[in-house]
Amino acid sequence: MTEWPEFAAGLAEQLAGLPAGAILTIVEAGGSRYAQFRQFDDLLYAELVGDEWLATENRTGDSGARLLAEAGWRRPDRYHTDNWWIEYPWPLTPQRYRDLVSIVLIGLRRVFEIAEPADLVYNAWNTEDGDRDLVLPGLGLRRVSK
C-alpha cells in the first residue's frame, strides 16, 4: 500500500515527466473530489474541484477555503470552471514540483479529508497524441478508464 509520503514523491516525479498535452486526473474512488493537472507547452496548470461541483456534505466550507487560499490556491471563478486553480510557468524545478504536490495534498488530505492514497484512482491521457492513455505507475494508484 502506498502511504502519503510515497504518493507525494511519486506524484512529483510523474508530473515532471508529463508531455505537453497530458491531462492527469486523481479522483476519490467512487466519489467526486479530485485534483487535475494539465501540461501545456509553456505552463503546468493544476486544479482542485470547487464547491460548485460537490454535494453539500463534501464541500470545503469556510475553514477549508481558508486553508486552500493560504496554501496558495487561487479561488474558484467562472474562467476556471469554478474550481480552485494554480499555474506555473514551465519548465518547473524539482522543488517547484514538490511545492505543488504539497498544496495538492493539503487539498486532498486536510480539506477533502481523504484518508489514504488507496482511496484514490487516476486517469491520464495525452490530448496531443490522439487522447492516447498514459500509464503512470509511479503514482502507486489504480488506473481507471475515461
Where do the language-model regions lie?
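Exposed alpha-helical structural elements
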Residues: 6, 10, 63-67, 99
